[in-house]
Amino acid sequence: MKIRTGCDVEQISRFEGLLKKAHFCQRAFTDAEWEHIENSGHPEATAAGIFCAKEAMAKALGRGLFGLLPKELGVEWDECGAPYPVLTGSAAEQYGQVQLAVSISHSGDTAFATCVALEE
């Protein structure tokens, strides 16, 4: 059994400009994530947290974003609002057998996420 962790931290204010770039948003966020960002009331913080989660997942998988699209490392939310990872495309093909858990947090102008990966 292998256990890996990944984490990432982002400056929330950086996403004020990034969210205005359609190309970035289309490549980085799924439709469900974009809907969550738009409905959050704090779009920059929400987007930064989601992006941190994607980076944390990529690191926990042991490769970073090399060869993966950020959009393939998805984040969805359960009925209590807790985030959980959803892999699609080549990420699902390569890592569908790996169990992932993700957590996202914010403080001031900082978003942080951590991911734990368990591979049997």
Please provide the spans of the model-predicted regions.
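Core catalytic alpha/beta fold that binds nucleotide/phospho-ligands
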Residues: 1-120
